[in-house]
Amino acid sequence: NLHTIEATTEIVQLLDSDEQIELAMNRWLKILAQHIQVDSAEIFQLQADTDTMNVAVEWLSPGQISYFDKTSGIPVNSFLHTEKPLVVSTDSLGKTGSEEIEEIGMKAVMIFPILKQESGNMVLSLNHRRQAHVWSMAEIKFTSDAVKILQSILTRRIQKNSLAGSYAALEEILDNVGCAIYVTDQNTGRMLFANQILKN
């Protein structure tokens, strides 16, 4: 679908962004949250030593107020300590493990670990607060792919290493987009990348 391709392209372009990491993360979160149409979205930086968290970036849909009255030193919800993605739709609330999500008034939540660090992990939270919602496979897949790109951006910034790792992850995502994509050098016109669909 065209919207998905446009949103994917916008997110992929952030790989080449030289802007401050907070700005890149803000743009990334806005593109993702608007595309899957959630009420609010946050990236939390968990503090390992104090069991508190900071709100690194937050996005709110029009009319929504932040759930948090401060951005640092917030007690961590236990469901944020997840090693793998946690997807809770309205129809699975009430089952074991989702009580805490229900208690804070969320109707549906997706939690994705972004970065593991000794100082504390970075975690994404996407939330439906107003109405019941059942996450679709398309929403989950888009989020998963977007997270992989953000991980590439962060890894690149942290290590300032070669582009090889990022492009491997990017290549994998672009090979699964479902349409042909190629990238050329604006100055020389030389093709820099073509995904598998185009090569076939």
Q: Which residues does each PLM region occupy?
A:
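Short beta-strand-to-loop transition segments that serve as allosteric relay/switch motifs
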Residues: 61, 122-134
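Short hydrophobic/glycine-rich mini-motifs in sensory/regulatory modules
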Residues: 114-124
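PAS/LOV and related PAS-like sensory modules
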Residues: 1-45, 145, 152, 163-189
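Soluble sensory domains of the PAS superfamily and closely related sensory modules
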Residues: 77-86, 92-95
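GAF sensory/regulatory domain recognition
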Residues: 30-33, 42-77, 83, 191-192, ...
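Signal-transducing coupling segments at domain and membrane junctions
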Residues: 89-108, 128
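A short, aliphatic-rich beta-strand micro-motif
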Residues: 107-115
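Amphipathic alpha-helical "output/dimerization" segments
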Residues: 134-155
